[in-house]
């Protein structure tokens, strides 16, 4: 993973210490640059352009969503950070509507191409900090997977808080991140730390803890909160409005 990060770190703003001039918080600039080509977009979504890997990981995420928050045929579902439509492709056939949200117009273009055969999908470009374009109480499920690692902690909470506004009463939320408390998460943390500060790209992944996710869900006013660690890697937070 970090071999890839080191190799392509200069794509955003040039080589050397110029990388540090683009802050992590400039999500739109960062992710628009990273998704200039569809191949690049897929690489940053999953680490490679392999379509079989893309489909397999989407299937795994679908199982995780089904077992945690449940997916119903009558659900209106929204994804925060939909990327190239990896998960949307397996969700759209089994829900009423699927809305893909992303900070990058390029990502949304590729996602629309991937999901072009479905009439129940739409796409929304975000600022990178909230869900303002989405109507209040318009969704039954809001989820975000493999996205929080790229966000600062304040913006993780922003999305969790605004997702509650977007959800209907009884609506379900799912979020995840790599957990610092796991073996995989600690190695991930150490590999990131080993990159010299001046060379750390703004999209570098950062971890969470179960306590962090639980605090966010509680502070945002959710109920039926469940936080778990799975596969010695991921922390998952689920809750109900």
Protein language model annotation of sequence segments:
Residues 79:
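Class I SAM-dependent methyltransferase core
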Residues 133-142:
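A short acidic, Gly/Pro-enriched loop at the edge of an enzyme's catalytic core
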Residues 141-155:
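A short SAM/SAH-binding and catalytic strip from SAM-dependent methyltransferases
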Residues 1-69, 73, 84-133, 151-158, ...:
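Class I (Rossmann-like) S-adenosyl-L-methionine-dependent methyltransferase catalytic domain
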């Amino acid at each position: 993973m970090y071999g890839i990060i080191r190799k392509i770190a200069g794509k955003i703003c040039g080589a050397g210490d110029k990388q540090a001039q683009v802050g992590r918080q400039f999500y739109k600039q960062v992710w628009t640059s990273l998704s200039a080509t569809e191949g690049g977009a897929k690489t940053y979504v999953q680490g490679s352009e392999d379509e079989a890997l893309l489909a397999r990981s989407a299937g795994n995420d679908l199982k995780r969503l089904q077992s945690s928050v449940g997916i119903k045929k009558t659900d209106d579902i929204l994804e925060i950070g939909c990327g190239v439509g990896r998960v949307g492709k397996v969700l759209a056939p089994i829900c009423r509507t699927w809305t893909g949200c992303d900070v990058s117009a390029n990502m949304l273009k590729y996602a629309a191409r991937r999901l072009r055969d479905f009439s129940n999908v739409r796409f929304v470009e975000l600022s990178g900090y909230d869900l303002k374009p989405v109507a209040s109480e318009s969704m039954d499920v809001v989820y975000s997977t493999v996205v929080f690692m790229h966000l600062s902690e304040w913006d993780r909470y922003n999305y969790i808080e605004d997702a509650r506004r977007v959800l209907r009463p009884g609506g379900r939320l799912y979020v995840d991140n790599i957990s610092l408390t796991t073996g995989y998460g600690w190695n991930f943390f150490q590999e990131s730390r080993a990159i010299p500060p001046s060379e750390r790209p703004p999209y570098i992944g950062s971890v969470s803890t179960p306590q962090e996710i639980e605090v966010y869900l509680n502070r945002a006013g959710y109920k039926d909160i469940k936080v778990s660690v799975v596969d010695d890697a991921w922390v998952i937070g689920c809750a109900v409005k």
